[in-house]
Curated annotation (Swiss-Prot):
Induction: By cobalt and urea or cyclohexanecarboxamide. NHase catalyzes the hydration of various nitrile compounds to the corresponding amides. Gene3D superfamilies: 2.30.30.50, Nitrile hydratase, beta subunit (1.10.472.20). It comes from Rhodococcus rhodochrous. It catalyses: an aliphatic primary amide = an aliphatic nitrile + H2O. This is High-molecular weight cobalt-containing nitrile hydratase subunit beta. Industrial production of acrylamide is now being developed using some of these enzymes. Heterodimer of an alpha and a beta chain. One of its GO terms (molecular function) is nitrile hydratase activity. Transmembrane segments: none annotated.
Amino acid sequence: MDGIHDTGGMTGYGPVPYQKDEPFFHYEWEGRTLSILTWMHLKGISWWDKSRFFRESMGNENYVNEIRNSYYTHWLSAAERILVADKIITEEERKHRVQEILEGRYTDRKPSRKFDPAQIEKAIERLHEPHSLALPGAEPSFSLGDKIKVKSMNPLGHTRCPKYVRNKIGEIVAYHGCQIYPESSSAGLGDDPRPLYTVAFSAQELWGDDGNGKDVVCVDLWEPYLISA
């Protein structure tokens, strides 16, 4: 899906605001949102690609309005939709809780059970522990050093292929095994592992004469996006 979320190579957004000694969370609810997402991850609820698709499909105006408030607003909206779509909660339950909060009636923040400190440490360790994401899948069609061309496409669903590399020629510089294919995962069709590569593009291939001849941009791209150059 092409939309306002895919801003690679675009200009006119102004300076990136910088806050010295910025806190991890500006509001308490942001930390609680991250806790919800961590819980979903530990429970095996597939949400990375689904959440991206839900955020992308909310419409450009809503996307901008939410992100002006807090980036975590995006994450919370997506988490709610995934929990409903996966039938973990009902839409009626979601609406009821939102209404309670809006009316100031939701005040019970005590956990329903006592937390095990060891479980918390395990969750933190799992988040930071390096590990391979490769899964069993098809043999790769390309090798290191191969010249490839990114397909010209205009997908209606979720994709991890940015607009600025489409129809451009690059070189395979790394292979990462077969990994979860975002197009399938975001649509609830399972992991569907496909070969994943890092492709290097010269800045001039991407930006023409405006590109610096010494610069290279590397992008991770799945095999279905690519054809031989």
